[in-house]
Design a protein with these regions (language model features):
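Glycine-/small-residue-rich beta->alpha transition segments that form the dinucleotide
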Residues: 4-9, 190-191
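A conserved FAD-binding loop/helix module that cradles the flavin
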Residues: 11-32, 181, 193-199
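Glycine-rich nucleotide phosphate-binding loop and flanking beta-alpha elements
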Residues: 8-10, 43, 173
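Short hydrophobic core segments
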Residues: 1-5, 29, 184-186
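A glycine-rich dinucleotide-binding beta-alpha-beta segment and adjacent secondary-structure elements
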Residues: 131-191
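Short helix/loop capping segments that flank catalytic or ligand/cofactor-binding pockets
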Residues: 11-13, 75-78, 85-86, 127-128, ...
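An anion/pyrophosphate-binding glycine-rich loop and adjacent beta-alpha core
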Residues: 28, 34-153
Length: 199
């Protein structure tokens, strides 16, 4: 038997996960008396599109997109003076969350969620059409915003569950370290072999 139900991203208000990722395998494991491990280890993508949670990929920041707070001032230099928007995901996600929690975010009235802006307006047509067409397309499709003329709302979005049902490197479920359950496997986000670390 293989458990492969995905993670539990739907417990978060903003997630990149599909609606089916509700932690079903985790619940089944707990009900069967099996342990879970490292459930606090959750990766957040820094720039999820407000509402659907879809990723606005790192590419938008790599090509020159700027994160801005409520007063439209950029803020990443405060958290990563040299790398700014190109800092590692976890640092950018924490910086955005800090700005929001300290009152410098913007409330999106349609979704009742606070966010910051990603500013892509200054990017050339070539960049918008060739280098980041999917990002521009997502903002148009899900938010009815044109990144050439509008600031776009983003916030950290639950992305990947590192913890889950303990397995060995073959995916066999472990009742305790070194003790596997014959014929029971966990794969993907519902399992945890500690390959990914905590982020």
């Amino acid at each position: 038997t293989v458990l492969a139900t995905g993670g539990c991203g739907q417990v978060f208000r903003v997630t990149t996960n599909c609606r089916q990722n509700t932690g079903d395998a985790h619940a089944v494991a707990l009900q069967a008396g099996l342990p879970l491990m490292d459930m606090e280890a959750v990766q957040f993508h820094p720039t999820g599109i407000v509402g659907p949670g879809n990723l606005a990929t790192e590419t938008q920041r790599y090509v020159g997109g700027n994160l801005r707070k409520k007063d439209l001032e950029p803020f990443m230099a405060k958290y990563a003076p040299k790398m700014k928007e190109l800092a590692p995901r976890d640092l950018v996600a924490r910086a955005i969350e800090t700005e929001i929690r300290e009152g410098r975010g913007i409330l999106n009235p349609d979704h009742n969620i606070e966010h910051v802006w990603i500013d892509l307006r200054h990017l050339s047509d070539y960049v918008q059409e060739v280098q980041i067409p999917e990002v521009s397309g997502f903002f148009k499709q899900f938010m009815n915003l044109n990144p050439r003329t509008h600031l776009c709302p983003v916030r950290p979005s639950n992305h990947y569950q590192m913890g889950g049902i303990p397995t060995n490197s073959f995916g066999e479920v472990q009742k305790s370290p070194g003790t596997t359950i014959s014929g029971l496997y966990a794969a993907g986000e519902c399992g945890c072999a500690s390959f990914h670390g905590f982020n």
